[in-house]
């Protein structure tokens, strides 16, 4: 019985030590002071109205253009910021020895105008995935050689790659 209780206690300690909170864009209010101290531009730290944003922790106000989209998570030892929508940028630190995120020039500005871009990208990739599937189906129906099929797929890949700058505008 003592062995069983010892194993149960050890297992619960391991679970506590390896606990990881889920990634969230809305940390609890009691944790906002912690998260907003070390990455000040995260959107969950600010209450924005009429192009002016007020910090929820220290009541400081800034322009809306310097706010970025952030997600946060933590495990037993480290705290992790996932910053941006298009180009991933990460900041991790030990929760007990936090450090300020000072590379705000790499943080992408977040505004509601990104939603049309995200929707456009999703539609674009959906159309091109149908094009890839159609290319493979065409090659199978016409009984084309593998070399010809690969050339068609490479051509479609080049078109996708070349259209990226246009899509991101």
Curated annotation (Swiss-Prot):
Chief subcellular location equals host cell
Q: How does it sit in the membrane?
A: Multi-pass membrane protein
Subcellular compartments: Host membrane
- Keywords attached to this entry: Host membrane, Membrane, Transmembrane, Transmembrane helix
Q: Where are the transmembrane segments?
A: 2-20, 121-141, 148-168
One Pfam family name is v110
- Its domain of life reads Viruses
Q: Which Cys residues form disulphide pairs?
A: none
Gene Ontology cellular component terms for the protein in this record: host cell membrane; membrane
Q: What are the coiled-coil residue ranges?
A: none
Q: Which family does it belong to?
A: Belongs to the asfivirus MGF 110 family.
- Outline what the protein does: Plays a role in virus cell tropism, and may be required for efficient virus replication in macrophages.
- Please report the name of this protein according to its UniProt entry: Protein MGF 110-12L
Protein species of origin:
African swine fever virus (isolate Pig/Kenya/KEN-50/1950)
């Amino acid at each position: 019985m003592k062995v069983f209780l010892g194993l149960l206690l050890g297992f619960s300690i391991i679970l506590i030590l390896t606990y990881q909170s889920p990634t969230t864009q809305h940390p609890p209010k009691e944790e906002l002071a912690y998260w907003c101290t070390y990455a000040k531009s995260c959107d969950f730290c600010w209450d924005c109205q009429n192009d002016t944003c007020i910090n929820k922790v220290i009541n400081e106000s800034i322009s809306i253009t310097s706010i970025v989209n952030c997600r946060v998570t933590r495990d037993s030892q480290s705290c992790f910021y996932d910053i941006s929508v298009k180009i991933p940028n990460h900041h991790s630190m030990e929760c007990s020895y936090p450090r300020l995120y000072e590379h705000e020039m790499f943080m992408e500005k977040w505004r509601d105008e990104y939603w049309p871009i995200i929707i456009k990208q999703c539609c674009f990739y959906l159309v091109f995935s149908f094009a890839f599937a159609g290319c493979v189906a065409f090659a199978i129906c016409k009984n084309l050689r593998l070399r010809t099929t690969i050339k068609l797929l490479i051509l479609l890949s080049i078109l996708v790659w070349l259209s990226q700058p246009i899509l991101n505008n």
